Amino acid sequence: MRSTNSFVVHNWVSLVPEMEMDTQERLYLLVDGAQISHLAQALYRLSGELVLEPLYLFPPFEQLKEVSPYLVLATDTVKTWFLEQNQGLAGFFFASLDSIEEIAEQLRRLIQVESPYGSTVFLKMANSECAYVLLSTQCQPLWKVINRAWLPTRQGWQYVQRPELTATQDTPVRFKLTDEQWQRLGNITWLNTLETVERHVQQWFPDLAQQWQSDPELFHRHAQWAYQQGFSSERDLMLFFNVLGFLGVDALEKGKYPEIDPLLHQASSRTPSQRIEAAAELAYQHSQSSQEVQG
């Protein structure tokens, strides 16, 4: 597993591809309100023509309008604004022959989708990497209103165009993700979690983060080990790295800290989240005691 930093496209604005379209096509931007704070206010401050549609406009999603994705006609002003945000995963450009109202209506059908296991989940379709997964796996409801798309990802800009789609029966009430789509979307969620955890460690435990400079894979190996122990949520992982930050990576060695060992290595009646929370608290207490002795 590579370091999260290796996925970041530095100076991605300078790498923007030419977005060539057919005569009748229009360029749109789908931008993520969950990634760009106060998105609506920022858009309405732009000068010139502004044509947009919030996707979370109607019940039962109107209460989420603050974090709604916005579909925007990508004028030069809008395009420049988005690129200047320097948040590559917060949206993508696409060309379409359809009106903004028609596109928005179709995209709203994808706000919630069905997982391969039958559960209902929100689809982060404005996240450029999530959109790339869907488009590259021939998600027909999305391709219905998209002719071609340009998507910034951690691996660089991706270009996709409408494939030859097989005829389908009537569209089901809720789109169901395939196993491949589900797995790839899960990988994106994991990478996003790792980036958040990595920033946490860099802020609070810079000495630990410094160790990753010479061995970038070390962070990922530790994160994967923690995941295998059941410490799978973002908070679990932060607490796990708190243990390493307070005590050092040798905290993982059995016998080094007998009171913490079973919390890290052994399943018990406690949930993994409860175990790692207790381990982090003990690690903090141990580090405080060590500082008092040294002081």
Curated annotation (Swiss-Prot):
Domain of life: Bacteria
Keywords carried by this UniProt record: Virulence
Phenotypic effect of disruption: Deletion results in an attenuated phenotype towards V.parahaemolyticus.
Function: Plays an accessory role in VasX-mediated bacterial killing.
Name of this chain's protein: Accessory protein VasW
Higher taxonomy: Bacteria, Pseudomonadati, Pseudomonadota, Gammaproteobacteria, Vibrionales
Gene it is expressed from: vasW
